[in-house]
């Protein structure tokens, strides 16, 4: 029995693809290992979204290729970098035995059979297909939460983004398939389902000819044993009144939304081809703020081609005024194959980094004030672990890996996956401390 390992880089959609590949291989009789040093076959599920992600993926391939001097026999690259650079990867990285694009990962077992016969395999170019339906998953997340992909690909045409080329056009999954998977995950012990897609709010537009996310949320919430539903990757132009009402009135949906806004200035939004403007964004924020205790996470991009000091100042004022609970700030990455690649003037790297730091400095104080307002109040916390004599976990305000944590002091015996109501005693810029 051969040992197979997988390293999953990039986004949560990649995580799900990795989990499906593991399930396919386990069913074929392969032994799954977490330690790459024990692997006979190693899969690297790459990210190719921005320059830093590409670099990380390539460095990982080169580093893992060194294991071929020892036990490792075959090295396979899958994911977005493979879809984007396919033939180039095989040519430039001789460590690789196979390259598989985003629409072909379900062929992983066949590919391994071919490389074991001495063939070098290249499979790509099918990013527009939705051909992984019904494949089981081996969860790589803790057993109490899981990501649930509701759609694949993207039909937005943001001028800075390569994703439509790497993941294909937007394809919603059928509601019955999503619900079946959600039920299976909850049966396995999952208490929090985190809904993801390139754009969760457009769910259903292609298949059902209308926005169906509110209905999907309603149906998922009927699953017994499910505690939290969390929504990531919402787009501002598709946040409807119906969706806001569903979030507001459905007890299982945490009052949290991740909604990448990218910028506040109309001219920058126009150059980004974001299909919205500042006024519409403000209306969406106002609608979301009508939900009691709502937490809004967003991301902004600084240093987009042509971003003037005036436009950046507008963004700074916007962040100060809107006081988002959670903010991520990225510097623009110039990517071949995007419209913005050819835009002028391109902003110097030093200016981009300076703007990123300025914006994060503003947000740091806002985040601290938000956290300070929780002191003395009670928060439900999902316990995730125990370290240095203290428990830690997440409240409804925190998505895994990207947000802060709540440290919980307790004499009681708690385990990962437990929900407790903690009294908050202290606050930091991104984390809270409580007692139970």
Curated annotation (Swiss-Prot):
Residues reported in the UniProt entry to bind [4Fe-4S] cluster 1 = 11, 47, 80
Main localization, broad class: cytoplasm
- Name-wise, this protein is Ribosomal protein uS12 methylthiotransferase RimO
Xref: PROSITE patterns: MTTASE_N, MTTASE_RADICAL, RADICAL_SAM, TRAM
| Cellular compartment(s) | Cytoplasm
Q: Which Gene3D superfamilies match?
A: Methylthiotransferase, N-terminal domain (3.40.50.12160), Nucleic acid-binding proteins (2.40.50.140), tm_1862 like domain (3.80.30.20)
MF-aspect GO terms: 4 iron, 4 sulfur cluster binding; aspartic acid methylthiotransferase activity; metal ion binding; protein methylthiotransferase activity
Q: Is-annotated flag, keyword Secreted?
A: no
Q: Where would I find the MTTase N-terminal domain in this sequence? A: 2-117
Function field: Catalyzes the methylthiolation of an aspartic acid residue of ribosomal protein uS12.
Q: Which residues form the Radical SAM core domain?
A: 140-369
Instruction: Please list the residue ranges annotated as the TRAM domain.
Output: 372-436
EC numbers for this chain: 2.8.4.4
Q: Which gene encodes it?
A: rimO
Gene Ontology terms, cellular component aspect? cytosol
């Amino acid at each position: 029995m051969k040992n197979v390992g997988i390293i999953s880089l990039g986004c949560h959609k990649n995580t799900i693809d990795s989990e499906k590949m593991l399930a396919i291989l386990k069913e074929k009789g392969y032994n799954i290992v977490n330690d790459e040093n024990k692997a006979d076959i190693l899969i690297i599920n790459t990210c190719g979204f921005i320059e830093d992600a590409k670099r990380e993926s390539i460095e990982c391939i080169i580093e893992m290729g060194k294991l071929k001097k020892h036990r490792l026999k075959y090295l396979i690259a899958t994911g977005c970098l493979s879809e984007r650079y396919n033939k180039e990867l095989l040519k430039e990285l001789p460590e690789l035995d196979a390259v598989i694009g985003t629409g072909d990962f379900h062929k992983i077992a066949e590919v391994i059979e071919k490389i074991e016969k001495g063939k070098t395999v290249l499979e790509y170019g099918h990013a527009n297909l939705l051909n992984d339906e019904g494949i089981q998953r081996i969860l790589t997340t803790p057993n109490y939460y899981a990501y649930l992909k509701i759609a694949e690909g993207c039909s937005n045409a943001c001028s800075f983004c390569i994703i439509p080329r790497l993941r294909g056009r937007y394809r919603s999954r059928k509601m019955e398939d999503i619900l079946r998977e959600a039920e299976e995950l909850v049966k396995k012990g999952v208490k929090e389902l985190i809904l993801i897609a390139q754009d969760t709010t457009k769910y259903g537009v292609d298949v059902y000819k209308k926005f169906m996310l509110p209905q999907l949320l309603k149906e998922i919430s009927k699953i017994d044993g499910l505690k939290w539903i969390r929504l990531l990757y919402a787009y501002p132009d598709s946040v409807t009144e119906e969706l806001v009402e569903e979030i507001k009135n459905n007890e299982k949906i945490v009052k949290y939304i991740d909604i990448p806004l990218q910028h506040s200035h109309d001219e920058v939004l126009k150059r980004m081809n974001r299909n919205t403007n500042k006024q519409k964004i403000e209306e969406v924020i106002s609608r979301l703020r009508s939900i009691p205790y709502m937490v809004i996470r967003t991301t902004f991009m600084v240093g987009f081609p042509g971003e003037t000091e005036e436009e950046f100042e507008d963004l700074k004022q916007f962040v100060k005024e809107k006081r988002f609970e959670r903010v991520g700030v990225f510097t623009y990455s110039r990517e071949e194959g995007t419209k913005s690649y050819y835009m002028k003037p391109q902003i110097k790297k030093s200016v981009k980094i300076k703007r990123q730091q300025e914006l994060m400095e503003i947000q740091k104080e806002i985040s601290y004030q938000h956290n300070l307002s929780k002191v003395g109040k009670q928060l439900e916390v999902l316990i995730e672990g125990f370290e240095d004599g203290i428990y830690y976990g997440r409240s409804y305000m925190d998505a895994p890996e990207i947000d802060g944590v709540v440290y919980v002091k307790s004499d009681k015996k708690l385990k990962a996956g437990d929900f407790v109501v903690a009294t908050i005693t202290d606050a930091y810029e991104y984390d809270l401390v409580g007692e139970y």
